[in-house]
Structure formats: C-alpha cells, structure tokens
Amino acid sequence: MQILNLFYNFAVKFDLNENIPNKAMKKIISIIFSAMMVTSLMAQSAEPKQRIVEDGGTGPYKAIMKEEASLAEHTIFAPQDLSVFNAKNRLPVLVWGNGACNNSPFEHYKFLNEIASYGFLVVATGFIPMNDDPYHGPMSTTQQQIESIDWAIAQNSDPDSPYYNKIDVKHIAAAGMSCGGLQTLFNCADKRITTLMICNSGLFKIENAHNAVGGMPMPPKEKLNEIHTPVIYILGGKPDIAYENGMDDFHRINHVPACAANLPVGHGGTYGQPHGGEFSVVALAWLQWQLKGDKKAALMFKGDDNLLQKREGWTLEKNEKFSKLK
C-alpha cells in the first residue's frame, strides 16, 4: 500500500509534465487509484473476525469469541477486558478439540464462551464460527492442540501481546469432545498439561475400532498410561455412543486421579443449549478447581456428599486416587 501511495504521489507531482500526454497521465492515475482501493478492501477483509456470544456469557468477565492473526485456524475465547488480568490475576488456559475432528468449534462455541467468561483463555482448534452453519471442510489435526499451547505460552512472554504477563502458563487444561477427546488423549503426555477433560469420548478397543470414523486419531488403550494429570470424563450416559469407550478408559486408569461424570443426554451433550447447559456447569467446576484451586468448586466432586450427585440426572464415579486430590 505504501508503494502504491508513492507511485500515486509521483504521478500527481508530474501530472503537468509536458512530456506525458494529459489523457495518458489521467489513465495512469486512475489505474493506480483502483489498485489502491482493491488493496485497501483486501486489507479490510483480512481483519481478524470477532463475535459476541450470548451477551458475553454469565460469568464476571464478559467474553468475546475472536480470531488472532498470530494463530491461524484457531478460535480464541477470552474476556473482553484484559486490563483486569495481570501477574497476580492470570488467565488459566483451556485448549479444545472439536467433535468429529471438525476444524471449527461451531458446535461448542456457547459452551466455550461460557467458560471464558469465568476468567479463562480458551483456544479452540479451527476456524471461527460466525453463524450456526455446520462446518464443511478438512478435518483438524492433533497438532493444532499443541499449536494452541505453544501460542498461549508465546503470547504470555511477548511484550507486544495484549496477553503479555496475563496468562497462567503453569495451569493448562487439554480437552475435547468425541474425536476432539481422542486428539486430547493423543496429546496427553505433554508435560505442560496440568489436567485433562475428556467429553463424550474414549479410546477404541481393538474389537470396536471398526466403528471409528476415518481420519480419527486411534491411539491404543496403552496410551492411557501416559496420562500424568488428574482427568475427568464427562459423558452422556448409556445413550452416548462413546459411553462404553469412555467408561472403559476410566476403569483402566488407576495411576492418576480420575472420575467419570454422566448425564444421560446422549452423545451430543448440552453444548448447544444456552450457555452450554449442564455440561458447562460441570466443566467449569472442574476447571475452577484444577486450574484455579477453587475449594468451593471442588465440592462439586469431592466426598460422598458431592454436589454433582445432587444435580438432577448426574452420576459420578471416582477411582481410588481421586480422594488424594486437594
């Protein structure tokens, strides 16, 4: 654009040059001006997109869904006002993988926006959904979750970033729904991750692997041994096609604290309901406990008198290690 401006100024300066016919000069100026307009329009269309979802969520920090030019093929959910966050009040991170390995969180944006409104930085795999149209395009990859973590850490260290020194890079949750849950389990060994949240998902066994959709990551059950953090499975009960896989995972995990929360709503969960429905309530409690150390949120899960079992329809199972969580 600057080069075009220089050419334009040059053309105007020499508009009266007798060696160049006036008609030809006008044509040159017209061409340059048209090129400037096209370039300007292209620049405007390249501006990162953003969208306010459900008035910013119900949390104390009204959220925004947006693109970041520094992270292609990802969608960011974050508080609109970052000025309240600093070294003493940081944003824990949630990196998210989508159902069907879609390269857009179009099915989960209400759920993710709600989480962000409680003071979390959510980095979802895929293109921003500017409406409710389904995504049609190539599948996402497991690497995009790693890119999300890399980006969050880099932003926290970059003095030119609006997130500079505002991100809690020591508290990172990896999560995903269905195929996104498989992506999360594929990445579970990453030492930067401090908790896992596996939603409507679970690893396939050899005998039912034929039910998997082509392109899904298919780590073996032995992958569960690489989990090094507390993990929650949030499932849709027996109507959920991932119920057996998820519960089988849960029963195999005995080396780290693990729990399985079930609400019999099926594989689709409640993500599309206002503010993400019941699944967002449980997910938020887990993240507030695991990433923010919120003892009140821990009551949703801890003890025989946990609050989750008092919510209509929910059941909660915990392994032996779970009681050691503080």
Predicted regions and their residues:
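Alpha/beta-hydrolase-fold serine-hydrolase catalytic core, especially in secreted/extracellular enzymes
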Residues: 256, 265-268, 273-326
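N-terminal cap/lid segment of alpha/beta-hydrolase-fold proteins
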Residues: 45-89
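Short glycine-enriched nucleophile-adjacent loop
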Residues: 181-190
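Short amphipathic alpha-helix adjacent to the substrate-entry channel of hydrolases
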Residues: 106-124
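The feature captures the conserved acid-bearing segment of alpha/beta-hydrolase catalytic domains
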Residues: 194-273
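Catalytic nucleophile-loop/oxyanion-hole region of alpha/beta-hydrolase
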Residues: 101-107, 111, 129-147
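Short beta-strand element of the alpha/beta-hydrolase
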Residues: 88-99
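Gly/Ser-rich "nucleophile elbow"/oxyanion-hole loop immediately N-terminal to the catalytic nucleophile
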Residues: 83-90, 134-182
